[in-house]
């Protein structure tokens, strides 16, 4: 038994993070404190000033732990990391956490690649960005690839090593084929240097050079070359124009503000570069009204700027009691001093008010849409409750489907709709194990039996406290099961449930001659549904989703089988050689056409293995 009185007495007078746990040992809240002793004790003393959510949380606390940190900044960072890791019930969830895209140049490779990434790492490569507008960065990459014939493959290409066959990009003049040794490392580097000059905003010297080349070509009557150089200059100017917006300057400023209603909040960020608003972002945080603005903003700043080294010099916020800790964290990220400021009056204060007003508008729009969607979804769920005469509204619906081609790679899928919305985290896939032929009924019997048997086992383990409720993947049973098939599949489901002693209503979908759903089969009766009703719209969403999920899984299994099964049958070709052949030739058809010499050029393929490949395809023609 946890001794609260004793543990509260020994809390340290130091900064740190505390973790509240329920009777199942689950972490339900994570918080930080400048002084752990003072902060944690507040929860278990006078509760008059506590919000309803805090009161509810404290009622569920069975024990607590704490971690002492060296500084307030460390506590701030650790709190955010633990919230992300455990997603505690009573913490706000920054679900819209996002990292902006960078352009990465892999300068640590002999023949560097240039591509978009959202993962910044100190790996010796060159990064440009971040770009708040993803559309702009994609346009920039497209322009770069249009004027510079760069490689886009992930091959490890080292100058002087054995060349490999070039891909299609070389033949359509989009790559200079360093893999075949058609361009030297030095020549390729010149191209990369030009790209990095443009991305760094140092485009003027390159444009002057291209202008001279264009005039020379024109003077020599090489009009096609001159036109090509002109197009290249225009593209570079377009890229350079975009880069000006994202180039980090000493006067870069971000303005962050928050607007809350009785339940949710919206954080809005305005990006100012050279005194102009160059972009903005919003982040919706549901069920967060109980948290103080300062707490939400601090957690947001740690999360938002945690994934990028490109932190502005000045960040303006409405209020904070953790400015020193935030400045320390942000300065480390930037590599130079960052100032977090709370303006009292003047232009900066007015800008923060503008940001807050925009946050309010965004939240209102968001709530309007959410309310409309919730209202429509609830109408649909009430319609199906009335249609099937259910005791309660089916807030959780599970739908099942089988996918196969002539009995091969049979797979089952389970999708979940909660409150009329898809809940992707609860989707499950089943690879059929016991059914060898194309038998949808037996396949459906197998996946339903596996799903609910596993669910019953988890429920027992939860009751015995062997696992936590949140760890159960199948323990949450539906209020309604929806079979994509008709009466036959419904009967299979009822048979499985009866065998397991589970009472859940099951309905099936009735199709017309064009395979479009026209109604529901329930208790052996066909119930027609108005094709324009909210209920029919929801059923179609469920049906489309279960089809998509099943077919996607089936396709991935089929592609793996098609790609590897033929090579699996060739003597002397193991996994390593199989991968080498596929890496070199790209497809089974190309391997079939390969000569002995071409096969011997492949890594790890000796004469014996090459002859085995030739012999196999000769005998299977």
Swiss-Prot record:
UniProt domain GIY-YIG: residue ranges:
13-92
Q: What is its main location?
A: cytoplasm
Keyword set includes Cytoplasm:
yes
Query: Does the UniProt entry include the keyword ATP-binding?
Result: no
Q: SMART domains given for it? A: GIYc
Compartment(s): Cytoplasm
UniProt keyword terms in alphabetical order: Cytoplasm, DNA damage, DNA excision, DNA repair, Excision nuclease, SOS response
Q: Which residues form a coiled coil?
A: none
Mind telling me which InterPro entries this protein's record contains? DisA/LigA_HHH, GIY-YIG_endonuc, GIY-YIG_endonuc_sf, GIY-YIG_UvrC_Cho, RuvA_2-like, UVR_dom, UVR_dom_sf, UvrABC_protein_C
Q: Which GO terms describe its cellular component?
A: cytoplasm; excinuclease repair complex
The Gene Ontology biological process annotation of the record reads: nucleotide-excision repair; SOS response
Identify one Pfam family in the record: UVR
Q: Name one GO molecular function term.
A: DNA binding
Q: Which residues form the UVR domain?
A: 204-239
Going by the entry's taxonomy, the superkingdom of the source organism is recorded as Bacteria
Q: What is this protein's function?
A: The UvrABC repair system catalyzes the recognition and processing of DNA lesions. UvrC both incises the 5' and 3' sides of the lesion. The N-terminal half is responsible for the 3' incision and the C-terminal half is responsible for the 5' incision.
On assembly, the entry states: Interacts with UvrB in an incision complex.
The UniProt similarity line reads: Belongs to the UvrC family.
Q: Which NCBIfam families match?
A: PRK00558.1-5, uvrC
The name this protein carries in UniProt is: UvrABC system protein C
Gene this chain is encoded by: uvrC
